[in-house]
Amino acid sequence: MRIALAPMEGLVDELLRDLLTRVGGIDWCVTEFVRVCDRLLPVAQFEKLAPELRHGWRTRAGTPMHLQLLGSDPACLAENAALAAELGAPAIDLNFGCPAKTSTARGADGCCSTSRNCCMPSSARCAGPCRRCAGDRQDAPGVRPARGRPGVRRALVEGGVAHLVVHARTKVEGYRPPASWEWLARVREAVAVPVYANRKSGRRRIGCREISGVEDVMLGCGLVSRPDLARQIAMRAPDARSSRRAGVRYSRWCASSGGAPGSGSRRATPLAGSSSGWACWRAVIRRRPRCSPNCAGRTTAGGWMPCWA
């Protein structure tokens, strides 16, 4: 079984990818989606969202990272995929739509998720310059997964994708449970490439596996709220200390960055002191503020700590 870290825009940046992959259990991760409109993007845009490209497209823990593209112009997608391949990207992830409103609002996934003739050249041309192309997609906005979607997936496979990541939810359904895992089983039967179940959390994972027959998963919010979830699933070995260490590294990074609460940067929030690894990490994610905008915390024998610890 393989476990991937979901590319949640505005949350999973290079810092969280580094921290989560250090805990262990994650086989590969994906960047936040790079929006492709009508032109070839500058290299700086790729470096901004994928700074790991300077280190061989791997996190500091050595976890491979894929580059995700979002757009509706197959030719422009192919052009940017070729540039990413020149920069050394090991795989291109084509986002054909996910339940996130920012992904489906502008029709970025429209032609790719509903038109067989459109998604084929897009995926094939993107797969050409790179070693392989991965498809991360959802069903057509507002349409139940039953209606013709396995045919679209077959078209993607014919275009050269190496695996498919399926949300099993529509735009209207969003992230509300339950997901249509029975249609994930139909997709798995229709294609000859690995299929991943894109899950919000690790809860009821066995139910998803039993219904769909899919072993591989992509985890999002569940990994952010519990950093050792992938490790626990893969090795059946919960490790709260790893989560606590990740939170401490996050706090030290915040202290060295000099950010202040309210600046719009998630990174400006330090770690709340606690004896529980999960409480530590959740305090980080919930953006617990400092006592004042100019508070720099305090230095103790154990290192930097926030003022209230």
Swiss-Prot record:
Site (described: Interacts with tRNA): R35, N95, Y175, R267, R286
Annotated catalysed reactions: 5,6-dihydrouridine(16) in tRNA + NADP(+) = uridine(16) in tRNA + NADPH + H(+); 5,6-dihydrouridine(16) in tRNA + NAD(+) = uridine(16) in tRNA + NADH + H(+)
Protein name: tRNA-dihydrouridine(16) synthase
Annotated residues for binding of FMN: P7, M8, E9, Q68, R137, N198, G220, C221
EC number: 1.3.1.-
Pfam families: Dus (PF01207)
Enzyme class, broadest EC rank: oxidoreductase
Residue positions of the active site: C98 (proton donor)
The keyword ATP-binding belongs to this UniProt entry's keyword annotation: no
Function: Catalyzes the synthesis of 5,6-dihydrouridine (D), a modified base found in the D-loop of most tRNAs, via the reduction of the C5-C6 double bond in target uridines. Specifically modifies U16 in tRNAs.
Organism taxonomic ancestry: Bacteria, Pseudomonadati, Pseudomonadota, Gammaproteobacteria, Pseudomonadales
Cofactor(s) needed by this chain: FMN
Origin: domain of life: Bacteria
Gene Ontology terms for molecular function: flavin adenine dinucleotide binding; FMN binding; tRNA binding; tRNA-dihydrouridine16 synthase activity
Family: Belongs to the Dus family. DusC subfamily.
Keywords: Flavoprotein, FMN, NADP, Oxidoreductase, RNA-binding, tRNA processing, tRNA-binding
Gene that encodes the chain: dusC
Organism: Azotobacter vinelandii
